[in-house]
């Protein structure tokens, strides 16, 4: 980076991009010699595109129209990046919860992205992450294969698309391979898929995924493991709960 006159950061609004952005801002904060060379292009919509999922939707000509809209990265944005990256790596998600509730952050899309990140914690109603529940919903609404589920999430159901197919597949596989699966076995993107009796009860809100299968995974810097209390997302109050 030291050899360039300007460094322009191009980032979308989703949690995948925003997480990379705060990591970079944390890094650049430690390099004051680069501060006056940092610029940013960031967006959550584009004229003529009804459902903007990201820069990958844009043609070369459309991308070219964004050049010139870059703005200098401010000290407040760098400092927010440092604080947000620290919170993202923390084993306690309450700092992220606080940031996700603010509407005055120096990075305009960060709060919504962090909220979407927290929504992929297990929910209090059924122990599912939002991505897991939307997958079951897609199947219940007629998606016949994992590939069609992914398409339904990206194009319709997901409020803030951020998962690529390689990131999404392990989520589908877990739903199928758990001790008490929520969907029928899948091997490829084209495998026929259907809800199991547990999957139907999960969608009805009469079963809990963690009660049936437990959990042991990381979500950012937070380790979710049972036995013991696990951080969950309360979809009614829009807040975190440890239970």
Question: What is each stretch, according to the model?
Answer:
Residues 17-25, 49-54, 162:
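A short acidic (Asp/Glu
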Residues 134-142, 152, 171:
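Short amphipathic alpha-helical elements of helix-turn-helix/winged-helix folds
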Residues 142-154, 164:
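Short acidic, hydrophobic short linear motifs in intrinsically disordered regions
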Residues 155-169:
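Short, positively charged loop/turn segments that connect secondary-structure elements
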Residues 60-140:
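A conserved mid-domain beta-alpha-beta active-site/ligand-binding segment of alpha/beta enzyme cores
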Residues 1-30:
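Long, hydrophobic/aromatic-enriched structural stretches that serve as scaffold segments
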Residues 166-169, 181-243:
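Accessory beta->alpha helical hairpin/"wing" motif in late/C-terminal subdomains of nucleic-acid enzymes
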Residues 40-65:
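Short, conserved secondary-structure transition motifs
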